[in-house]
Amino acid sequence: MESQQLSQHSHISHGSACASVTSKEVHTNQDPLDVSASKTEECEKASTKANSQQTTTPASSAVPENPHHASPQTAQSHSPQNGPYPQQCMMTQNQANPSGWSFYGHPSMIPYTPYQMSPMYFPPGPQSQFPQYPSSVGTPLSTPSPESGNTFTDSSSADSDMTSTKKYVRPPPMLTSPNDFPNWVKTYIKFLQNSNLGGIIPTVNGKPVRQITDDELTFLYNTFQIFAPSQFLPTWVKDILSVDYTDIMKILSKSIEKMQSDTQEANDIVTLANLQYNGSTPADAFETKVTNIIDRLNNNGIHINNKVACQLIMRGLSGEYKFLRYTRHRHLNMTVAELFLDIHAIYEEQQGSRNSKPNYRRNLSDEKNDSRSYTNTTKPKVIARNPQKTNNSKSKTARAHNVSTSNNSPSTDNDSISKSTTEPIQLNNKHDLHLGQELTESTVNHTNHSDDELPGHLLLDSGASRTLIRSAHHIHSASSNPDINVVDAQKRNIPINAIGDLQFHFQDNTKTSIKVLHTPNIAYDLLSLNELAAVDITACFTKNVLERSDGTVLAPIVQYGDFYWVSKRYLLPSNISVPTINNVHTSESTRKYPYPFIHRMLAHANAQTIRYSLKNNTITYFNESDVDWSSAIDYQCPDCLIGKSTKHRHIKGSRLKYQNSYEPFQYLHTDIFGPVHNLPKSAPSYFISFTDETTKFRWVYPLHDRREDSILDVFTTILAFIKNQFQASVLVIQMDRGSEYTNRTLHKFLEKNGITPCYTTTADSRAHGVAERLNRTLLDDCRTQLQCSGLPNHLWFSAIEFSTIVRNSLASPKSKKSARQHAGLAGLDISTLLPFGQPVIVNDHNPNSKIHPRGIPGYALHPSRNSYGYIIYLPSLKKTVDTTNYVILQGKESRLDQFNYDALTFDEDLNRLTASYHSFIASNEIQESNDLNIESDHDFQSDIELHPEQPRNVLSKAVSPTDSTPPSTHTEDSKRVSKTNIRAPREVDPNISESNILPSKKRSSTPQISNIESTGSGGMHKLNVPLLAPMSQSNTHESSHASKSKDFRHSDSYSENETNHTNVPISSTGGTNNKTVPQISDQETEKRIIHRSPSIDASPPENNSSHNIVPIKTPTTVSEQNTEESIIADLPLPDLPPESPTEFPDPFKELPPINSRQTNSSLGGIGDSNAYTTINSKKRSLEDNETEIKVSRDTWNTKNMRSLEPPRSKKRIHLIAAVKAVKSIKPIRTTLRYDEAITYNKDIKEKEKYIEAYHKEVNQLLKMKTWDTDEYYDRKEIDPKRVINSMFIFNKKRDGTHKARFVARGDIQHPDTYDSGMQSNTVHHYALMTSLSLALDNNYYITQLDISSAYLYADIKEELYIRPPPHLGMNDKLIRLKKSLYGLKQSGANWYETIKSYLIQQCGMEEVRGWSCVFKNSQVTICLFVDDMVLFSKNLNSNKRIIDKLKMQYDTKIINLGESDEEIQYDILGLEIKYQRGKYMKLGMENSLTEKIPKLNVPLNPKGRKLSAPGQPGLYIDQQELELEEDDYKMKVHEMQKLIGLASYVGYKFRFDLLYYINTLAQHILFPSKQVLDMTYELIQFIWNTRDKQLIWHKSKPVKPTNKLVVISDASYGNQPYYKSQIGNIYLLNGKVIGGKSTKASLTCTSTTEAEIHAISESVPLLNNLSYLIQELDKKPITKGLLTDSKSTISIIISNNEEKFRNRFFGTKAMRLRDEVSGNHLHVCYIETKKNIADVMTKPLPIKTFKLLTNKWIH
C-alpha cells in the first residue's frame, strides 16, 4: 500500500544509508504496519552499501542547509547548548553506544537542530541514561558498525553474551511535505518497533501495551523533532503540539486510527471489485453484504453511483444469474435495487425448481437462442457499421488492448456464449482510488469482449473491404505481411500481424476460403461482405441467411443488438499458436528511442510522416535508425483517437451489389429538409423526399411541421400510391435517426405493413448519400429557379416540385435512362411544360362586373398533379390556381421585376413549342368551361397570405401616373390590365411608404390647410409658415375651396416676382393681429373641388387677451377663476422669458425645404415634429386624403416590382413589418443556472457563496415542508402532465448577497394543472408613487419589510409532482408538492390570496377597490409587491403593531423601520429613495445604473462630450430594406432587447422625460439597423451621463387642505408609421410628477384636434382611478384638472353644437369626452405649448426646449 507514495522520497538526509522505505503491497488481512522481511533485508543491504561508500568530512555547521544533501558530522560536532549532558545526546565513533541504541553509533544520525535551542527543550536528567532494553527473541538489533568495526554491547548482557552481534536499526526518512506525513508515520512507527519500543505504540483502541518512561518520552520527543521538521507538519499535528508540545503519543494514536480507517476502505473496495455470486447463498445475504459495503464507502467520501455498482455486481454473477449481464447491460438508468429484484426473482425460481422441477429454468444457451429468435421478429436492416468501433472512444480503445492479451479458445457452436470471458476488477490497495474520488466506469477494467458483442460470432460488415479477426486459432497459412496498409474509420493505420486464409465449412458440406488479416486491436471480428461476394456468397437480410447466387442456403444470420452476426462454428480451426502469430514481423530493438515517445514529441504526427521527415533530414540530431519502429505498427495513441476522430469511410459502390436483390419500388430512401424560416404560416416549412433505389424515381411532399401524424400521413400516401400505380410493395425504407423516423408511431406503422426500417449511423450523412444528394440537388434547383424568375420565397416548394418533375425525366449518365423510363412511364411531353415563373394571363371566370377586365396576370409554376391544367400563381389574388385557361406572355427579360408591360409580346418559339398541346385542348373542347379555372385543391399554397400583418388595402394603392404621362397611354393601360394590382410582394413591399402610396410630388409641395387651427402651433403667437390655401375674409366656421399648387420643390428661388398671388388675412394662433400671406394664382394650381363641410378646426372667437386659462364654461365669478388659476399654480412649469413683438417674417424666406420624408416623419423613426411640424398646419381633411390617394394602373412598373427581387442569402427585414411585429419587450435573463454558478464557475470565492446560498435554500425548503417527504413516487405511475420540471437559479442582489432559488418551470406547465382565471397581483407603480407623494405631504413614517420565501407559505390545491433536487440523488423518483413553489403559474395567485386574507382578517386591513395590493385602515397604508411591503403611517407605533402581527405568521425582516428624523435612504422596488420627513423626497437609480450599464457592453464615452438631450429633431430612420446574416440579426435583436429593456425599466420608474425615445426605439427592436443601434447607444449614453439625476419632490404647502390631481396632455399629429399620432400624458399630484405615458395612438387621426381629443380621452380613465385612490388614502377634498395646449379641443368640450362633428366616429369620441369632463367635474384649462411639459412625451425636442421643460421636476 505504501509503495506508491514512499517511493517519492528517493533520498534521505544526514547520511542515511537507506534512501526510502520500499515495501511490497500489504495484504488485506495483514497488519498495515507490518513490512515484509525480505524488503527489510534488501533495504539494509542497500544501507550497508551506501554507508561503506560514505566519507566523513568536517562540517562547518551542525545543521545541514539542504536536508536532501546533508554532510556527515565529525566526532567534534557541537552538542546542545542548553543540556548538561551533551555527550549523552551526541556520541562519537569511539564511544560505546548504550545497548539497544546502536542507531546512534553513527555520528551523523542526530544532527544539531534548532529545536534544542528552545527553552522548552526537555533534556534527560543527570542520572538518566539512554534507554537500555534487553534483547528479545526475534527483535532485530544492531550489528557491528560497518564503518568502525566495533561491536557495541549491551551493558546488562555483556557477561552472558559478549560475542553476540546485532544489526543496525534502520532510521526513518526525513519528512519533507505535509502530504507525506501519513507514509512517514508508518516508517517512524516501524523505526520504534525495531528499537524495541513497540510496547509504547498505541493500539487500535488508542492505549499502549505498557506505560512509557521519561527516558523513552525524551527519546520519542527528540527523534520526532529531528525527523519531522515543524514546517512540514500537517495542520492537525500542529494543533496538537500547540496544546502540548510533548504529546507525541496522541499524534501516533490519531495516525494509527486514520490508517485503520483507510485499511477498511481499501478492503471494501477490493471486496466490491471481486464480488462473486452463483446462488449458493441466499440472495438476501448477498444484497445485505453489497449494500453495506456501498453505504460505508459513500459515508467515507467514496461515491459509488448506480451504474458502477450495477456493473460490479453483474461482473460477479455466474451460473444461472449470468444472463443478467446480457439483458441488463443496455439499461442506462438501472438501479441497484432493480438489479437485486431480478436476482431475488431468479433465486426464488431456482429454489422452486430444485424442489419441484429440476429442469424448470432454461440454461443460458437456450436463453441466447430464444433472444435471437425474438430479435428477428421484425425485418432485418442492412447495416454499414464502423469496422473500427474501438476508435470511437477512449474506453473502446482500452477494451481493444485487453482483447489483444486474452487467449480465446475456439468456439464451435452458439453455446460458447455461456462461457465467462470477464475478469474481476483487481484493486489490491486503497491507492487505486483515493479518498473522495468517485468510482466511475473508467475505474473498472474492461472485459475482452465489447458490451454489444455476441461472443463466438463474426460481425457482418458491408462497409469493410477486408476481413479482420483477433484470434489466431482460425487462420490458415499465416505469413507476415509488412506491405499491407489497413486504416480504420479515423484514417489511422491498423497494425496487422499476419495474413492468412479463413476457411468455412458450411451446412451444405461445401468449403470456402477467403483472405483474413490478423490484428488484436479491434473490438469485433469483422467478416467483410465484399470478400464474401467475391466467392459468390451474399447476405440475404430478408431471409436472414448467407446464400449462394443459386439460392443455396449456407448459414443462418443472427441479429444481436444493432448488428448481424454469423457463428464461428462454420470456421475450421488451425494449428498455429498465438505466440507464433503475435511474433510475426516483430523484431527486438535495443537502445533505440521508443516510437510512442517520438510520436508525442513530434506533435502526434503519424508514423509515415515522421519516417519520411527523418529520411529527408528535415529533423536533425537523430536518424531513422535511432527509432524503434516495431511498436509503430500496432501503436494506437488514445489522444489521437479522441482528438482526431472522424467518421468511417464508405466504400464507393459498396451498395450496388445489393440493388439487384430488390425489384423496383421495394427499397426507398427518404429524408426531410427544413425548416425554411421567415415564411407565411400558409406556406410549408419542410419537404420530405423519397427515392427508389432501383429506378431512382423521386417524390416530394410538402410539410408544415415534423410531427408524427404529419409524417405518418405522407408515408401512408406514398405507400398507397406505389401499391396502386406500380403494383409493388415496399420492403425496406432507409432513413436517418431523426426523431421523426424513430418514433413509436411510425415504427408500429412500418411493422404493421411488413416494412423493414433501415437506419443510418447518427450524424453520418455520407451513409445516407442518396437522399442527402437529392435534397441538395433540389435546393440548388430551387434557388436557381427563384433567382431566375424573381418570384417570392414563399413559392419555394413549387420550384422544388417543378425540379422533381424535370429530374425524373432526365436520363442518368450511368444507366442511360431516365427514372420515368425505369419505372415504365412515358417520357415527359415538353409541350405541356412552361418555364418556371413564365408570365401568363389567366382568364377570370368570375369577374366583379361585366365591364371588369377578364385577364389576370400570373406566373406559371408547374404542371398540375390532379388535372391536365397548370398551377399558376396570381399575385393580385394572393393564391395559386389550377387552370388551362391562360395565355403565355414572354418579354425580353426573364426577371419578374424587370417586365415592361408595354413591351410584352408572344414568343414565337414558345408558341410553336406548345402549339400541339393547345391544339389538342382546342380540338377536345366542346365549349368554354369556367370550371377549369378553379383554385387548386391539391396545392398547399392556395390562398397564401404573403404577410399576416400586412394591411390588405396597401397593395391596391399604387403610384398614380405622373403629369407627363400621355392620356392615351393611361387609357391603353387600363384596357390591357385590370385595375387590381397584379402582384404581391415577397414579404412586405420595401417601397410601401408615403412615396408610392400617396402622390408625393403634389402632396409634399402643398401643405394643404382648409382652415386655420389655432392649435396648429400649440398657441404660438406667430406663424412661421405660409398658408397656401385661399381663405375667406369672414369669421365663419366654414372652410373655403382649397387649391393645390404644382411642384415647386426643385426651384432654386421663389419670390413674389415669379408668382402672382393675393394677400389673405389670417388670424394668428396666438391671438395677435391678422397677417397676410400670399396666395398662389390659379394658373399654378391644380383645381380640385372640395365639398364644404362644417369645420371643427377653426379657432373660436377670442379676444386679444394674454390670459392663458380657458375655462370649460364661461362663468364670470372670481371664485371660478381662482380655482382655475390654482390648478396652474405650483406645477413644475418652465419660466419663459418675455418676448418682444416681432414682425411676421417673410413666409417664403423661412419656408423649409420640402421633403417627402417629412410628410410622415416617423415612418422612418424619430421624426422632426418640433422644428416645423409644430409650427406648420398639421391638418389634412379626410376628403383631401380620399382625393389625393389614387390607385395606379401601371402595375407592371419597374419600381413597384422591386419587392419581388430574387431571394438572397441574407435575412431581409422591412421597417414597417418589424415595427408592427413588436408586441412587447422580451425579458432578458439576469439569473444564472446551476452549471454557470457552481459547476463551471472559475471564481472560487463566488462559487463558495453560491454553494452556501444553495444549501440555505434547500434548508428553507425543508423547513417550510414544501413537498411530502414521507413518500416518493415512481415516474411511471404519475401522469406526465402533472410532473413539473424544476431547476435552481442563482443571482447576486444589489446589496451584494448571493441568492439561490429553487423554482418550477412554469413556462412549460400544462394548462390543466392550474386555474387560468386566478390572478397574481402586485402593487401598481402609480399606486406606489401616489402613496409616496401623500407620505411626503402628510409627514408619514415609511417602513420597508421583506417576507422570506413568501410563496412557500401558500398551500397548493392541485396535485402536482416535481423531480427532487439534485443533491438527493433520486432522478427516477417524484415528490408531491405541498406548497406554492416559485415559478408555478398559480403560485403568485395563491400567495396573493393567502396574504390578502391574513391582512384583512388578522391585521384589520381592507383592500382599496380597483387597486390590488393596496391595503389600508384608519392609520396604516400598505403597498404589497410579492414579498416586499411598504408601510405608511402617521404614527410609527401603528407600523410596529402591523409588524408584530406579521411576525406571528411569517418570517418578516425589517429592511428599514424609518424612525429617523434625518434623511433616510430606501431601496424600494428598484427605486433609490432619499426621504426626509416634512421636507423632500428624491427618487433615482444612480447606484443601480452605475452597476448595470457597464455590463451591457455599450461603447460608453465617459471623457468625451456629454449628450445634452436623448435625441434631436430631424433624425430619420432609413426605410431601406435591411439585410443581415441570420446569426448577426439574432445577435443584434438580442442586444436591442437588453438595451431597450433597461431603458424601459428606468423610464417607467422615474425618468418620464425619456419615454418618447424609449417607445419609438422599442418599435424598432426587430429592425436593428446600424442607425437604430446608434440611436439606442446614444440613449443609453444619455442615461449614463445623467444617471445621477433624480425626480425631485418637495412638500406642498396648499392654501386649502385639498389634494390637487392634474394631467397634462399633448399629441403630435401623424408623426408615427402609417400616420399614427403620438400621444403623451403626465400626471401630477400636488405639483409632484408621479407618472407619465407616451404611446402611439391606436387609431389613425385625421387632424390635430382628433389627436388631441384622443390623447385626452386616454388620460381621463387613469385620472379618475387615481382620484379614487387618493380619496381612499387621504380623506381630503380633491381638485382634478386637465391641461392641454389645443384651443380647438377645449372649444369642442365647452360647445353644445354637434354640427362640428364631421363623422360618427369623431362625434361619439367627442361626446364621450364631454360626458367624462362634466360628469367627473374636471377643470379643463389651456396651457401654452412652450410651457407644456407633456411635449417631451410626443416628439423629439431641441436641447434648449428639452432642458427648459424638464429642469424643474427632474435634475
Swiss-Prot record:
Residues 1038-1053 have a biased composition (Basic and acidic residues). Residues 1-93, 126-173, 352-421, 956-1087, 1092-1111, 1130-1187 are annotated as: Disordered. One of its GO terms (biological process) is DNA integration. One of its GO terms (cellular component) is cytoplasm. Disulfide bonds: none annotated. It is found in: Cytoplasm; Nucleus. The active site is at D461 (for protease activity). Residues 1338-1476 form the Reverse transcriptase Ty1/copia-type domain. Mg(2+) 2 binds at D1346, D1427, D1428. Its EC number is 3.4.23.-, 2.7.7.49, 2.7.7.7, 3.1.26.4. This is Transposon Ty1-GR1 Gag-Pol polyprotein.
